[in-house]
Amino acid sequence: TSTAYIVYSLVLAGTTAFDLGGPVNKAAGFVALGFTTEKILPITARTIAIVTPSIGLGLSTLIDRRLVGRKVYEDEFYELGKTSMFLAIMGISEGAIPFALERPSFTIPLYVVGSIIGAMSGVILGAEQWFPESAIWAWPLVKNLGVYILGILIGAVIIAVVNVYYRNNLIKKGKLVIDED
């Protein structure tokens, strides 16, 4: 794995996760698509970064009560979390947008960092995806699929755990109020 490919993957993952299907994401996609269709560079970092934030936020709604002993989201976010994970498996990152809209100054950088760490883990450990699709039906085309999934999980777990502890800290400080059932 060359240094240039590592830098490209890092930038690609960050720009892909930044706005979840928005213009920065689309610009990154056009560049990546050009490289992958010409067989210059694989699109692995992008396909991992597309699904990582949505899986991470969905996961956070499943583990919050086990991790910190309380809800850290309003009730509607628990359903949105399940939807977010389902959409991620379909290759759609926009399921994480409602979470980003609530606290964008924290959540968006978290998406970027978690996606970069997950994508770089997959890339450095040898996952390789040339087909420009992040949905589960394209996963059989991934070289080293186990490592690819590991990269997604690493990034998603980072996003989930950090977000749960961040929100729990806000609750403790009285900066976030969640109705307990």
Indicate where each model-derived feature is located:
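Pore-lining transmembrane helices
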Residues: 1-178
